[in-house]
């Protein structure tokens, strides 16, 4: 029996991840039983990865307008934010978790390629890449294999494509052992009048496929990303796409030149679900905007690289480096000429129609004829409101010992050696961060990466962040903190936070406790974004990040990853994070209630994350951001670095070490009225929010303190930057830390390589 002759039944639908109710709904929409090609189309378009059917009801609660947004969330391939001078920033973050779990190198590489295509299909040139990675314990040999593959995949693709990888973060937690997270973010710059919409309109306008030929790689990749991982997932390596960064580089240049012709009407990347998603979504946008639309294509015209491909396979292929273009009728040859110049395929495969359907022909037959709106989010795709029920983590209480029994020198070195704290230089040295010559500082020298915008004095700051341990302990607070820390990092550079994108990584949404984590963390994100006036431009939801290995269920920590951009009006105001001058005063901004809950120290020393996330005061955070920007504009600061993972001692040590060309030490004197037996542990290692360590010339201190007072923010002078070989920290005039800077640096810079057993890779 031919593929096209299959008589579709409920069994086929269930094998495609569709429920009986959804199959019935499809039959009602079509007025008949779907063909196998139509079933494949519905299965990917109604998958969680494409339809957000389990998440959209919650996502709609996020602030999606305001600020400098030029597009609403979900309206286009990526968010678009006005930065003045007729320029806009396009940016987006997405996940490639499941592919990276079974094929780490290609999974990560194609994640990078896909997110860059989302940016340049809007007419923007990608100028920076970021990534956020989560792995299991580095003690596990398979985790080390995954780390190696993912890092090489990101580096090889990004370096070859010619876009700098400027920032990111990596955490190691047991819960990610079988299900790593690979979240990639791209940032691009575009002139307002050169932006392109992912919309099909204009009856009779030709539809072109451009880029690589279509193969069988990645078929059902979207569905694969919408189910739990298991041992059987290893068999789904064909669902992992294969990338070619050199082909994508040619595609980028050809596409930007084609846009310059003025004949590109609409443009969309072929990412998840390939030709299916691009034809469906572009048609639906055209109908929504203009009241009429649709696309008809002939698959016999699609360049394929494997013989005998069925319509089902061609429609669902996720072969990389492909895009769909709607051209102005009569000018398609002009566009084809541009692509031929760059040695990139460009072929007319159909046209825009006026019957509001996606119609697919193959070998002289219509194999799919579906109302476009029925396929997409906000149209006919199902929307579910799942049960949410809180299930507090059963974490043990920390059986803390008295400060008097502890050696804080040893504890400080041990904490700096933790994989979650230690330098990630082994990772970022594999990435080219300086290509395009716009990156203003080396990796790690600022709290957020900053890219210069050529032709202006402006810079764009960017950061990704999420401490999933906080979200696990308290989803509402954790969601707030993820946004707050991104904004704090951006403000530390002197930039003003503008907007966010998000990548929401969670377990199975059908489990009430998981859906509770999802809803509450999104609520926290929304509250923070409203307070900071940083609207949400869009993003990605990745559910089903749970694995079953040898019958044992393993769920990831809930990880709502935030990607944020900010604007630095004058790059001369850029503030670094490291000590720069001996004799500078060290100031501590912010004075919250100290707690060890959620801290890396508590996990290291007492084997528990505690009972709650640190508290966060959003109004305090907003004032902190405004103050940091004001201090930068008045050029009062030499450095600013927030207190986060590891607490105050780690923040001070990082400020001392991160400028490897000229490391400087510190003499810090703290006071503490807390008489408890664990007060020193709290003061050194608490990850309490809303704090920043500043350094400034002595003559600037009075002005800084006066400005902090104007913003009603507590600030204290805690010490001095010194050009010596040891760091020293005293509490109530008793020295509790005294370490050679060389020992501190060795612990910090070599621990990750040791933990990953790099000599064995």
Swiss-Prot record:
Annotated keywords: ATP-binding, Cytoplasm, Ligase, Magnesium, Metal-binding, Nucleotide-binding, Purine biosynthesis
GO BP annotations, alphabetical order: 'de novo' IMP biosynthetic process
Subcellular location: Cytoplasm
Entry keyword Ligase: yes
Catalytic activity: N(2)-formyl-N(1)-(5-phospho-beta-D-ribosyl)glycinamide + L-glutamine + ATP + H2O = 2-formamido-N(1)-(5-O-phospho-beta-D-ribosyl)acetamidine + L-glutamate + ADP + phosphate + H(+)
SUPFAM superfamilies, sorted: PurM C-terminal domain-like (SSF56042), PurM N-terminal domain-like (SSF55326)
Record: residues binding ATP: 52, 92, 502, 539
Family matches, as Pfam families: AIRS, AIRS_C, FGAR-AT_linker
Residues bound to substrate: 95-98, 117, 241, 318-320, 542
Protein EC: 6.3.5.3
Binding site for Mg(2+) 2: 118, 269
List of residues binding Mg(2+) 1: 94, 540
List of catalytic residues: 49, 96 (proton acceptor)
Entry's Gene Ontology cellular component terms: cytoplasm
Signal peptide start-end: none
Predominant cellular place of this UniProt entry's protein: cytoplasm
Pathway: Purine metabolism; IMP biosynthesis via de novo pathway; 5-amino-1-(5-phospho-D-ribosyl)imidazole from N(2)-formyl-N(1)-(5-phospho-D-ribosyl)glycinamide: step 1/2
GO molecular function: ATP binding; magnesium ion binding; phosphoribosylformylglycinamidine synthase activity
Binding partners and assembly: Monomer. Part of the FGAM synthase complex composed of 1 PurL, 1 PurQ and 2 PurS subunits.
Family the UniProt entry places it in: Belongs to the FGAMS family.
Purpose of the protein: Part of the phosphoribosylformylglycinamidine synthase complex involved in the purines biosynthetic pathway. Catalyzes the ATP-dependent conversion of formylglycinamide ribonucleotide (FGAR) and glutamine to yield formylglycinamidine ribonucleotide (FGAM) and glutamate. The FGAM synthase complex is composed of three subunits. PurQ produces an ammonia molecule by converting glutamine to glutamate. PurL transfers the ammonia molecule to FGAR to form FGAM in an ATP-dependent manner.
Name of the protein: Phosphoribosylformylglycinamidine synthase subunit PurL
Biological source species: Chlorobium chlorochromatii (strain CaD3)
Taxonomic lineage from the root: Bacteria, Pseudomonadati, Chlorobiota, Chlorobiia, Chlorobiales
């Amino acid at each position: 029996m031919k593929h096209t002759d299959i008589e579709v039944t409920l069994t086929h639908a269930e094998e495609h991840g569709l429920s009986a109710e959804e199959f019935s709904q499809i039959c009602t929409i079509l007025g008949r039983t779907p063909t196998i090609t139509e079933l494949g189309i519905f299965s990917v378009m109604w998958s969680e990865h494409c339809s957000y059917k389990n998440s959209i009801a919650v996502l709609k609660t996020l602030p999606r307008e305001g600020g400098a947004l030029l597009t609403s969330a979900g309206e286009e391939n990526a968010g678009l934010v006005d930065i003045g001078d007729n320029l806009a920033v396009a940016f987006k973050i997405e996940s490639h978790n499941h592919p990276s779990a079974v094929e780490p190198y290609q999974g990560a590489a194609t994640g990078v390629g896909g997110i860059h295509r989302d940016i340049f299909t809007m007419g923007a040139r990608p100028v920076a890449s970021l990534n956020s990675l989560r792995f299991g314990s580095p003690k596990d040999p398979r985790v080390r294999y995954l780390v190696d593959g993912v890092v090489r995949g990101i580096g090889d693709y990004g370096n070859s494509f010619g876009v700098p990888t400027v920032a990111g973060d990596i955490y190691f937690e047991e819960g990610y052992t079988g299900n790593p997270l690979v979240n990639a973010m791209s940032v691009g710059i575009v002139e307002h009048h050169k932006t392109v919409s992912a919309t099909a309109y204009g009856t009779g306008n030709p539809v072109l496929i451009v880029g690589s030929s279509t193969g069988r790689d990645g078929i059902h990749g979207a569905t694969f990303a919408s189910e739990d991982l298991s041992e059987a997932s290893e068999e789904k390596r064909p669902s992992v796409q294969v990338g070619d960064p050199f082909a994508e580089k040619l595609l980028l240049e050809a596409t930007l030149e084609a846009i310059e012709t003025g004949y590109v009407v609409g443009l969309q990347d072929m990412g998840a679900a390939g030709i299916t998603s691009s034809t469906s979504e572009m048609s639906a946008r055209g109908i929504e905007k203009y009241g009429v639309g649709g696309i008809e294509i002939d698959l016999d015209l699609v360049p394929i690289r494997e013989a005998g491909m069925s319509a089902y396979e061609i429609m669902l292929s996720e072969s990389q480096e492909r895009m769909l273009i709607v051209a102005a009728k009569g000018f398609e040859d002009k566009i084809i000429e541009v692509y031929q110049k760059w040695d990139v395929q460009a072929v007319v495969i159909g046209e825009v129609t006026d019957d509001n359907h996606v119609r697919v022909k193959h070998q002289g037959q219509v194999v799919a004829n579906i109302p476009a709106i029925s396929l997409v989010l906000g149209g006919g795709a199902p929307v579910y409101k799942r049960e949410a029920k809180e299930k507090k983590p059963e974490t043990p209480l920390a059986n803390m010992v008295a400060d008097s029994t502890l050696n804080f020198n040893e504890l400080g070195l041990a904490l700096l050696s933790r994989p979650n704290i230690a330098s990630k230089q082994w990772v970022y040295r594999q990435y080219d961060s300086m290509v395009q010559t716009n990156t203003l500082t080396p990796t790690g020298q600022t709290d957020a990466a900053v890219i210069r915008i050529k032709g202006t004095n402006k810079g764009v700051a960017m950061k990704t962040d999420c401490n999933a341990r906080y979200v696990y302990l308290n989803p509402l607070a954790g969601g707030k903190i993820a946004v707050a820390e991104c904004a704090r990092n951006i403000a530390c550079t002197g930039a003003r936070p503008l907007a966010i994108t998000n990548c929401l990584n969670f377990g199975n949404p059908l489990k009430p406790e998981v859906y509770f984590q999802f809803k509450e963390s999104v609520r926290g994100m929304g509250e923070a974004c409203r307070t900071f006036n940083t609207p949400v431009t869009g993003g990605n939801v990745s559910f089903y990040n749970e694995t079953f290995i040898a019958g044992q269920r393993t769920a990831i920590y809930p990880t709502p990853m935030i990607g944020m951009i900010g604007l630095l009006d004058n790059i001369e105001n850029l503030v670094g994070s490291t000590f720069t001058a001996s004799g500078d005063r060290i100031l501590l901004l912010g004075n919250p209630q100290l707690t060890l809950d959620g801290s890396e120290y508590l996990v290291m020393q007492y084997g528990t994350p505690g009972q709650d996330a640190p508290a966060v005061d959003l109004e305090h955070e907003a004032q902190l951001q405004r103050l940091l920007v004001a201090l930068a504009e008045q050029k009062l600061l030499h450095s600013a670095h927030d207190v986060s993972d590891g607490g105050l001692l780690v923040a001070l040590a990082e400020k001392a070490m991160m400028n490897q060309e000229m490391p400087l030490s510190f003499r810090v004197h703290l006071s503490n009225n807390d008489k408890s037996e664990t007060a020193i542990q709290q003061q050194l290692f608490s990850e309490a929010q809303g704090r920043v360590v500043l350094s400034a010339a002595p003559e600037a201190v009075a002005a800084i303190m006066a400005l902090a007072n104007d913003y009603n923010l507590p600030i204290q002078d805690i010490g001095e930057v010194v050009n010596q070989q040891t760091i020293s920290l005293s509490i109530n005039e008793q020295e509790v830390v005294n370490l050679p800077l060389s020992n501190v640096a060795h612990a910090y810079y070599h621990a990750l390589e040791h933990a990953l057993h790099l000599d064995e890779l």
